[in-house]
């Protein structure tokens, strides 16, 4: 069964996240670093900081991650697969030393952040839609990493 219109709508219903981008960006990266402290060095905007601090670069990167997942949801519904619009994503992830466990950590942080942002609107169905969309994106990035 392919990605449905309803699943895409659930992924795109993240207005709560957009309304508090600074707070949820900090939460997202805090969860990433709690799960994988060594990942701090993978993010240029976190390298020289004592912890996760709000910054335009942090917010921009978080919005990019969430935006890529939303785009993946649309592609999964229309094409059944995710094709990266940014051909350099694979090379960037290789250059940074990203490995398979990093994708798991980011997925867990993403899902926890969405759960917090969704509040009473959170559901297993919402969680699954985001998870499937993220998995599609991760698969596309890993594929691009192999050819980078």
Swiss-Prot record:
One of its GO terms (biological process) is nodulation. Nitrated in effective nodules and particularly in hypoxic conditions; this mechanism may play a protective role in the symbiosis by buffering toxic peroxynitrite NO(2)(-). Nitration level decrease during nodule senescence. The modification Nitrated tyrosine is found at residues 24, 29, 134. The modification Phosphoserine is found at residue 44. Root nodules. Induction: Strongly reduced levels in boron-deficient nodules. Inhibited by abscisic acid (ABA) in parallel with lower nitrogen fixation in nodules. Heme b binds at residues 44, 93, 96. Leghemoglobin that reversibly binds oxygen O(2) through a pentacoordinated heme iron. In root nodules, facilitates the diffusion of oxygen to the bacteroids while preventing the bacterial nitrogenase from being inactivated by buffering dioxygen, nitric oxide and carbon monoxide, and promoting the formation of reactive oxygen species (ROS, e.g. H(2)O(2)). This role is essential for symbiotic nitrogen fixation (SNF). This is Leghemoglobin-1. It comes from Pisum sativum (Garden pea).
């Amino acid at each position: 069964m392919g990605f449905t219109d309803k699943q895409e709508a659930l992924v795109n219903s993240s207005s709560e996240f957009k309304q508090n981008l600074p707070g949820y960006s900090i939460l997202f990266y805090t969860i990433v670093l709690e799960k994988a402290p060594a990942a701090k060095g993978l993010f240029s905007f976190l390298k020289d900081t004592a912890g996760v601090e709000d910054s335009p670069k942090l917010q921009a990167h978080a919005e990019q991650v969430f935006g890529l997942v939303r785009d993946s949801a649309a592609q999964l519904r229309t094409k059944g697969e995710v094709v990266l619009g940014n051909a350099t994503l694979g090379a960037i992830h290789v250059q940074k030393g990203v490995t398979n466990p990093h994708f798991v950590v980011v997925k867990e942080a993403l899902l926890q952040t969405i759960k917090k942002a969704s509040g009473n609107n959170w559901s297993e169905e919402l969680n699954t839609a985001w998870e499937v969309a993220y998995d599609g994106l991760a698969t596309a990035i890993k594929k691009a990493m192999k050819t980078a």
